[in-house]
UniProtKB/Swiss-Prot annotation:
Predominant subcellular localization, coarse grouping: secreted
Key word Ribosomal protein present: no
Role noted for this protein: Possesses antifungal activity against P.infestans but not F.graminearum.
Temperature dependence: Thermostable. Still active after heating at 100 degrees Celsius for 20 minutes.
Official protein name in the record: Antifungal protein 4
Biological process per Gene Ontology, one example term: xenobiotic metabolic process
Cellular component, GO annotation: extracellular region
Keywords: Antibiotic, Antimicrobial, Fungicide, Secreted
Subcellular location: Secreted
Other remarks on this protein: Antimicrobial activity is not affected by salt concentration.
Organism superkingdom: Eukaryota
Length: 37
């Protein structure tokens, strides 16, 4: 669980830093789907 939280925090940082969140959002979706199954 802690690892997942850290990954989420890193993605949030990247989202804030990156002006084009499209790629980050897609990566986040992939991670979520990968986690679920």
């Amino acid at each position: 669980d802690r690892q997942i939280d850290m990954e989420e925090q890193q993605l949030e940082k990247l989202n804030k830093q990156d002006r084009x969140p499209g790629l980050r959002y897609a990566a986040k979706q992939q991670m979520x789907t990968x986690r679920m199954g």
